[in-house]
Regions:
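Acidic-aromatic/histidine active-site loop/patch
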Residues: 160-213, 220-223, 327, 333-337
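Asparagine-centered strand-capping/turn motif at beta-strand->loop junctions
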Residues: 77-81, 219-222
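Hydrophobic or amphipathic alpha-helical targeting/insertion segments
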Residues: 117, 121-150
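N-terminal edge beta-strand
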Residues: 48-66, 195-205, 330-346
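Extended terminal and domain-junction accessory segments
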Residues: 27-34, 139-171, 246-346
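C-terminal segment of N-terminal export signals and the immediately downstream linker at the start
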Residues: 1, 19-46, 50-52
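Extracytoplasmic beta-sandwich strand-turn segments characteristic of Greek-key/jelly-roll folds
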Residues: 60, 65-67, 89-123, 203-205, ...
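N-terminal export signals
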Residues: 6-26
Length: 346
């Protein structure tokens, strides 16, 4: 571990202050980025109060990191927080020493220090990165961002759309309810839920899509506890083509469910069908985003990827039943409220 000042003196890293790749080695395909964790302010919607958050490079979500399959990614991580941190590369089949697990695979990056992550990306898919010390607080405050590995360099030329979702527990002034961070009641039950939903760091954004052709939507749930459920428009069907960064045998559905940290890629055959994205996990339909067509068409997307690994035989599989009960009171089926019994299960 080295200090920020010494690191800059030795490497000249002070010249590179954004998360945009600042050089590419043609022989080794090294994509270089710099991420700085610090306190920052962010507006979830125009003309509203700015919220105090902890962010990478002052962005919510953090900057998009892109690479091609078999590239090497090099990230200079600078910690400008008042407490230690580290960065985990969620879903990447990584080198153990670069996986970002404090104490186990690396020392904590102390305030004012820097750490260089350098690892190959072996798989194309949808991934993300996030703080990995006190994640229940640091990730909740905004320290995360998307990481997309492509099979080619045509990511920006395609109807390839990121849908990064998070829920935030905010007060009437749009400030975080920091008093609830680390709440043991939440931990022992279903976790700390938020009361406001963002897509790509914004309340109910307009998402641009090409006016015709296919579209790939990359869904990513960065909430720390909430299981999210999405549908498009009024229940139109689409194809799931990848889960957790790996292509799958495509199948049709009209809703997707994402647990915390989960990613699902879907394919829409015709973007003219896209109107609204709705979150429906509570039983109510909440419009999370609106799709806005732009006058450009796109050719057929290349999504016919085979799963990376063959499906194992289940002939001699050992069956293990896992009961997902949701923590304390997870088995509660009903309760009496105001003298009336209310059922919790349909």
């Amino acid at each position: 571990m080295i200090s920020r000042r010494k690191f800059i003196q030795n490497t000249g890293a002070g010249l590179f202050l954004t998360a945009i790749p600042y050089s590419t080695n043609a022989l080794n395909n090294i994509k270089k980025y710099e991420l700085t964790a610090k306190k920052a302010k962010h507006s979830f919607e125009k003309n509203q109060n700015k919220t105090d958050l902890w962010l990478f490079n002052n962005n919510c979500p953090g900057p998009l990191i892109t690479a091609n399959k078999n590239d090497v990614i090099e990230i200079i991580f600078n910690n400008q927080l008042d407490e230690p941190s580290a960065v985990h590369w969620h879903g990447i089949r990584n080198i153990n020493s670069m996986d970002g697990v404090p104490v186990l695979s690396q020392p904590l990056v102390e305030p004012g220090e820097s750490f260089v992550y350098r690892f190959p990306v072996k798989d194309a898919g949808t991934f993300w990165y996030h703080a990995h010390n006190k994640a229940w607080e640091q990730v909740t405050r905004g320290l995360y961002g998307p990481l997309i590995v492509s099979d080619n360099d045509q990511l920006k030329e395609k109807n390839d759309i990121l849908v990064l979702a998070d829920d935030w527990l905010l007060n009437e002034n749009l400030q975080m309810d920091v008093s609830s961070l680390g709440n043991l009641h939440d931990w022992s039950h279903a976790g700390r839920y938020g009361n406001r939903l963002t897509i790509n760091g914004v309340f109910k954004p307009n998402i641009e899509v090409f006016s015709s052709g296919q579209a790939r939507l990359r869904f990513l749930n960065t909430a720390n506890a909430r299981v999210l459920k999405f549908m498009l428009n009024d229940d139109i069907y689409f194809r799931v083509i990848a889960t957790d960064g790996s292509p799958c045998n495509p199948f049709k559905t009209n809703k997707i469910v994402l647990g915390p940290g989960q990613r699902i890629d879907i394919l829409i055959d015709e973007t003219t069908k896209l109107k609204h994205l709705k979150e429906v996990s509570t039983g109510n339909e909440l419009v999370a985003a609106t799709f806005e067509p732009k006058n450009q068409s796109v050719s057929v997307l290349d999504f016919n990827k085979k799963p990376y690994y063959p499906f194992p035989s289940l002939n001699n599989a050992k069956v293990i039943n896992i009961h997902m009960q949701g923590g304390a009171m997870g088995n509660l089926k009903s309760a009496i409220f105001n003298g009336e019994r209310r059922e919790f299960r349909n």
